[in-house]
UniProtKB/Swiss-Prot annotation:
This is Argininosuccinate synthase. It comes from Halorhodospira halophila (strain DSM 244 / SL1). It holds the Pfam family Arginosuc_syn_C. The gene is argG. It is an enzyme of class 6 (ligase). ATP binds at residues 10-18, 37, 118.
Amino acid sequence: MSDVKKVVLAYSGGLDTSVILKWLEETYGCEVVTFTADLGQGEELEPARRKAEAFGIREIYVDDLREEFARDFVFPMFRANAVYEGEYLLGTSIARPLIAKRQVEIARETGADAVAHGATGKGNDQVRFELGYYGLEPGIKVIAPWREWDLNSRERLLQYAERHGIDIEGKREEGGAPYSMDANLLHISYEGGVLEDTWTEAEEAMWLWTNAPEAAPDEPQYIDIAFAGGDPVAIDGERLSPAALLGRLNDLGARHGIGRIDIVENRYVGMKSRGCYETPGGTILLRAHRAMESITLDRDAAHLKDELMPRYAELVYNGYWFAPEREALQAMIDQTQQDVEGTVRLKLYKGNVIVVGRQSPKSLFDASVATFEDDAGAYDQKDAEGFIRLNALRLRLGAKRRG
């Protein structure tokens, strides 16, 4: 790819991507456009702009994508109740397609012929980014420095930075933090370092977002979440934008010690990896959404969704957000959400999210039918006999054959 003229780099301003920026200029002799995404990671992003300016970069993009992230990526995923391997709420996985999408858009806007990312050759993110690139712009050139260069240790990166006068001050990870961290509006992840020993408990100081459950308030807090079309639209009667609503749930969940997990997951590239995650708002939202569905979804539609959910979650985890099979599943899921409307009441207490009430104008729950009291003929219990005998037929035939 020696003919690369201009490349759009996903740029954080940290050590890795700053070295990549200089390396791209040196190796390819190309112009670099930097792109820094605000996905709600809580960092001041202007330092990334200033650092890019110090490199002499002429085209610098620092984009606030929080609303698009929540509205067009997080919320559609939560309509599916997507959970990977029973625990992971896909906070990193769902962010990569949006970054890839915006990189491709910037490449088109600036006339760039290539994109670049800072994901390593061992992880899932390289796959997620590049499947996104190719799914949106099949002819794009992709540069993945970690698969090309020999700067395969932090010491070599630091030496390269020193030789080229790259400022590496002020970043926590550059000071030798014991974890690799990634944050956005949905979660914070922690990997590597001491966590590579699967028997070692993560230190309390690692968790940057949530209170420990035992340190959470001793009094529970009740909240109401309103839904329309399968998406949350209000908390305690206050309508909020998608990003603001998720941010509010994060604050509530963090205060009450909600959303910590410590898991070993199966990466798409084949290895197992330990990760610790904080997903306070997402944990609340998942519980609330399932409660809302419990009274508004038809039984078999709900069961079909649950059967398909692991496949949907796997597609998101592996990076197939823009693939036709994910889009087909999304269309089916979205059709089921038309009547997912109403309010769920939750009790938040020391790491727990407890559903205590749900109501909907589209509810399929009919107390006059479900009651244990006199139902005034709404349900004839004698009808159950024929239903049971028909469903028992194959079991009776099997028992007869066995003698």
